[in-house]
Amino acid sequence: MKAFLGALEFQENEYEELKELYESLKTKQKPHTLFISCVDSRVVPNLITGTKPGELYVICNMGNVNPPKTSYKESLSTIASIEYAIAHVGVQNLIICGHSDCGACGSVHLIHDETTKAKTPYIANWIQFLEPVKEELKNHPQFSNHFAKRSWLTERLNARLQLNNLLSYDFIQEKASKNELKIFGWHYIIETGRIYNYNFESHFFEPIGETIKQRKSHENF
């Protein structure tokens, strides 16, 4: 089994290369960023951010969903983990990372009949959190039946929805308003490796390099 062989390789070689780092993490962690992404196997947070163990606090679920405050009881695990990262671990940044070819977002365009819901009731219940995206798409000026364009738009609207959902929580809004927590929305394109960041002022997703240039010009980034 590949996972077992990989674990052995890690123990005998890769661990040794970062032994001092792992030893320093024995009794503490101080990640700088809370990274919320999809469970998709093609999205590897530490790989796409170039970070080492101890730098990211990662939460993954189907569709990188953050239920709004009005529905928090339906996803206690997610919001409890977010609260822990912010209130106790003290992360300084929060990134919502959507991605291309997202199955959860793609399901927005499918007809969910009762038979399908009966076969996978837990998935059907979770996907309901994406209903606002479906409604927004109906009259969106950029909506297209072209599969790739439609997928990207859906994924980006979902990332924006999840950002808004996060800000419905007082403890997150308070940290953000004091500039103690910086919040970002990403759209990662699997086949090209490109990452786009949501611009809260223009309401568009821009190449991540543009975001870095803008922030470097007026703050320590």
Swiss-Prot record:
Catalytic activity, per the record?
A: hydrogencarbonate + H(+) = CO2 + H2O
Question: What EC number(s) has UniProt assigned to this enzyme?
Answer: 4.2.1.1
Q: Does the keyword Metal-binding apply?
A: yes
Q: Which UniProt keywords apply?
A: Lyase, Metal-binding, Zinc
How does the cofactor bind to this protein, according to its record? Binds 1 zinc ion per subunit.
Q: Which Gene3D superfamilies match?
A: Carbonic anhydrase
Q: Name one Pfam family in it.
A: Pro_CA
Domain of life according to the entry: Bacteria
Required co-factor(s) are: Zn(2+)
- Does the UniProt entry include the keyword Thylakoid? no
| SUPFAM superfamilies reported in the protein's UniProt record | beta-carbonic anhydrase, cab
Q: What class of enzyme is it?
A: lyase
One Gene Ontology biological process: carbon utilization
Q: Which residues bind Zn(2+)?
A: C38, D40, H99, C102
Example of a GO MF term: zinc ion binding
User: What family, per the record?
Assistant: Belongs to the beta-class carbonic anhydrase family.
Q: What protein name does the entry list?
A: Carbonic anhydrase
